[in-house]
Amino acid sequence: MTNMRKSHPLAKIINESLIDLPAPSNISAWWNFGSLLGICLILQILTGLFLAMHYTADTTTAFSSVTHICRDVNYGWIIRYMHANGASMFFICLFIHVGRGMYYGSYTFSETWNIGILLLFAAMATAFMGYVLPWGQMSFWGATVITNLLSAIPYIGTNLVEWVWGGFSVDKATLTRFFAFHFILPFIISALAAVHLLFLHETGSNNPSGMVSDSDKIPFHPYYTIKDILGLLLLILVLMLLVLFSPDLLGDPDNYTPANPLSTPPHIKPEWYFLFAYAILRSIPNKLGGVLALVLSILILAVIPLLHTSKQRSMMFRPLSQCLFWLLTADLLTLTWIGGQPVEHPFMTMGQLASILYFSILLILMPISGTIENRLLKW
């Protein structure tokens, strides 16, 4: 008689995804972040659900309802801070996951990669709308500034902004719809993640060498379940250190002031994980140009598979491309730092240079280095 996990229709899906899944024998800890993202998503949905039970999506009571969660609800403070810092952990895992895909050439699985880009956009939209919900100063002004970017779209821009706002300014209608979207999007992300995995399991996982590893596969359980549990423990450790010791480290103090449309904060900036894109947006003086650069800074990921010129898939044995990859990493960290600085002399120039470097590495230097490395192979 066959094992139930192999014959039962539902158990069979779980079995083929988590237990008997053939996995390459040499995948490193960088392959841990996919499962960590799944766990982060589950954590965010659960904590978000409990927050939604006490939150009120109304401009007059939103701020005080968040205060009520922290002060009066049993363990409300820990749920709130786990949700806020869980988002930061989510994006740390996301950026590492995308970086690993770029480094080891996982983008050659085009369907998996493109759905991954959709997932990234969905996660960014969810996080942005979640940041608006506490209705603090930075929530209100962040929402005003970012939604206003739509007005840069020629002809339909102004109508589009008012349509998104549900009025002539960010107000009750905006908050209510943002809450509705913030609630539904994580479930859409879950569905997209399932499709992401479906396409991944069609081809099988990539590995550090970038070569086909069909002849050397091992079952996912127990080898990688144990390996993933180590990553999970480290993730929980870092998250709980943040939550219990410095829950506001990655937040903005302005968000502890209730939203006031009559007073603008000195520096309007989004959460830290959007600062790199925000710096690219600010580095272009033209509004429409800035918005295009902002969208392209993420959408550029879709072009990476088309610009792959190397005969080798992975960067493991490509020193030139490795140098460019780590230069890109340093550039993104620089952009993140600049995004949090005021729009003043040295930062503006640095932001423009860092933005040019970002696009140059991905669009020009990476393909050139791949071609040079192909030539070097013939020597």
From Swiss-Prot:
Cofactor: heme b
Membrane-crossing residue ranges in chain numbering: 33-53, 77-98, 113-133, 178-198, 226-246, 288-308, 320-340, 347-367
Keywords noted in UniProt: Electron transport, Heme, Iron, Membrane, Metal-binding, Mitochondrion, Mitochondrion inner membrane, Respiratory chain, Transmembrane, Transmembrane helix, Transport, Ubiquinone
GO BP: mitochondrial electron transport, ubiquinol to cytochrome c
Membrane topology field: Multi-pass membrane protein
GO function term, MF aspect, one: metal ion binding
Residues binding a ubiquinone, per UniProt: H201
Co-factor binding details: Binds 2 heme b groups non-covalently.
GO terms for cellular component: mitochondrial inner membrane; respiratory chain complex III
PANTHER family in the cross-refs: CYTOCHROME B
Subunit record text: The cytochrome bc1 complex contains 11 subunits: 3 respiratory subunits (MT-CYB, CYC1 and UQCRFS1), 2 core proteins (UQCRC1 and UQCRC2) and 6 low-molecular weight proteins (UQCRH/QCR6, UQCRB/QCR7, UQCRQ/QCR8, UQCR10/QCR9, UQCR11/QCR10 and a cleavage product of UQCRFS1). This cytochrome bc1 complex then forms a dimer.
Family listed: Belongs to the cytochrome b family.
Miscellaneous comment text of the record: Heme 1 (or BL or b562) is low-potential and absorbs at about 562 nm, and heme 2 (or BH or b566) is high-potential and absorbs at about 566 nm.
UniProt-recorded name of the protein: Cytochrome b
